[in-house]
């Protein structure tokens, strides 16, 4: 069952339920690809990219939402694209839900350490607590949009893609270290 939190999550859950119902009724051949939070090159619009990685790249203080020690699964955007193409071109993959492959989870503290190793220098970070987001929320449209995602940052947010890894064992997953080396 889907347990959506927020306006956008409710819409996504309804869409997924509609697709799954049509698949179940043999009215539609489709796949659903699910992914954890994206990170990647260029203009990837994710919390981790915009608040954390982009700031590090700009040599500014990076922001960590809510909690720096919770583990998070992240997927490299080029990996997500390659995985979806692979699934789409595999007839036996249809009429299923797939969790796209990602590296092991890391905390923001660990991401900071990896970034420091890649850059060979110290990185400045600060944690923005939930009450701080709530304080700014009435005055900032971006924070209003972001607020429905904040519960995901209170605790570990782990993504399991074992089914994909078993079905496609030769798929090369970009490690967080490789990804950060490319971005930074």
Indicate residue ranges for each PLM-predicted region.
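Active-site Tyr-X1-5-Lys
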Residues: 3-32
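NAD(P)-dependent short-chain dehydrogenase/reductase
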Residues: 25-32, 36-71
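A conserved structural motif in NAD(P)-dependent oxidoreductases
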Residues: 73-80
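Alpha-helical membrane-targeting segments
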Residues: 51-73, 124-157
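Residue-level signal for the nucleotide or nucleotide-sugar donor/cofactor binding architecture
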Residues: 10, 75, 106, 159, ...
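Mid/C-terminal beta-alpha module of Rossmann-like enzyme folds, strongest
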Residues: 83-146, 172-176, 180-184
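Short, flexible helix-coil linker/hinge segments at the edges of structured domains or between repeats
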Residues: 1-8, 49-54
């Amino acid at each position: 069952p889907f347990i959506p939190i927020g306006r956008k999550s409710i819409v996504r859950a309804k869409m997924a339920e509609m697709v799954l119902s049509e698949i179940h009724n043999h009215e539609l051949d489709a796949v659903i690809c699910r992914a954890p939070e994206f990170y990647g090159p260029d203009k990837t619009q994710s919390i981790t990219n915009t608040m954390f990685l982009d700031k590090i790249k700009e040599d500014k203080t990076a922001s960590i939402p809510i909690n720096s020690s919770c583990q998070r699964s992240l997927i490299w955007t080029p990996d997500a694209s390659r995985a979806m193409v692979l699934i789409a071109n595999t007839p036996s993959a249809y009429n299923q839900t797939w969790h796209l492959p990602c590296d092991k989870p890391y905390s923001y503290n660990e991401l900071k350490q990896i970034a420091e190793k890649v850059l060979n220098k110290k990185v400045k970070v600060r944690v923005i607590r939930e009450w701080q987001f709530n304080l700014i929320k009435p005055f900032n449209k971006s924070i209003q949009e972001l607020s429905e995602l904040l519960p995901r940052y209170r605790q570990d947010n782990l993504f399991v893609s074992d089914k994909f890894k078993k079905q496609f064992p030769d798929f090369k997953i970009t490690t967080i270290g490789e990804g950060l080396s490319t971005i930074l």
